[in-house]
Each structure stands twice: as C-alpha cells, then as structure tokens.
C-alpha cells in the first residue's frame, strides 16, 4: 500500500507481494519487481539474485528474456551452531515423492573443528539413488553458511560429489567437511566386484613374486 499499485491496478498475491510472471514482470511490460516486494523468498541474497533478472529483462526483454532461476536458493539460520541448507531436505523429498539417498558426515571427526573446539554438527547430503547428483544439502555447525557455498555451486552447475571429492581442499580447514561427506558417499558406492578382482590379482602377484624369489634362492651361484 502507498506505492500507487492500487491506482495502476497491479495485483498482489495472498502473501501481499506484487504479482509477477517468471520474468519478474508485472501486468505492465515496463514495470518489474524483485526482492521482498515480489517474493517468494524474503532473503537479501535472493533479492540480489532477482535484481539481475529484473534488470536484464527490463533492458533487453524485447530481444530475449530470462526466467528467474530458483533451483538452488540457499538459506542459513544464524543460531549457535549455524544451520544452512540448499535444495531438498528429507521432509520435502518425501512430500514430493522424490527418490533419494542420504549421506551424513559428522563434523566432530574433522581436524580443524577439533582444534578450534567446534567439533559438533554434520553435513547431510541428499543424492539421486545410485548417482552423485546432489538434490539437497543441510549443514549444521560453525560456519555452516560459508560451507554450504560449495554445494550451492555444485547444484547450480551440475557438479556431482565425485568432482567435489576430486577437488583439493586445504588442510586443516572446515571446508574439508564437504570433501569428506563426498568421500563417505563414495565409500558407500564402492565397486565391490572390481575390488574383489583387484584383491585376487594382487594376491596372485604376491604369490608369483614369492615363487620367483624362491627359484632365485635355489639357483646355484
């Protein structure tokens, strides 16, 4: 109220936000809205995210428009310890009937957390069953709002846990928790058949080496 929306006839939603389309455009092609007034998220970082789409669409919409992408919107609750998340959690996955697997890594095992007296919390990752694609992540612990960024990037750009595991993380840092969570997922999906074949191969090689050493010992000098 008080911004002239009533006079212009621009509708508002039940949540009392300005009604916009996927391009953040109101019923008037030259009026856009973003941030808290547009919703659906009341976050400063989401407002900044929307501002890019609103600005670009307002300036260049006659050539091409971009729908606002909400596929990887993160948020954090700055309690003690912090709680941060992005994507689906288990409750949402069940409500939407989305199949998922859960991998959990306890931050109490992390060297940096132990050294700083912050050895509590966890990293919980939801993935597509049998694949490393990230569906959502929840982190509880010190600096959770900082740690979640790696997973935001992973979800936004289609990076799986294998890539995170293969990325060098500085030791000792809290960020290693992300790598170790990916490592926990990898261990749960290790190729059992291949490992058994490798075990047999090395056992055979050890036996072969032992036989060769025995023959060399028996040969006259």
Question: Model segments located where?
Answer:
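Rossmann-like dinucleotide-binding cores of NAD(P)H-dependent redox enzymes
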Residues: 41-48, 56-92
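Flexible, glycine-rich terminal cap/loop adjacent to redox cofactors
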Residues: 73, 78-89, 94-221
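FAD-site-proximal beta/loop scaffold in flavoenzymes
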Residues: 1-64, 150, 165
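Solvent-exposed alpha-helices and their adjacent loops that cap or buttress functional pockets
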Residues: 25-26, 30, 69-70, 115-117
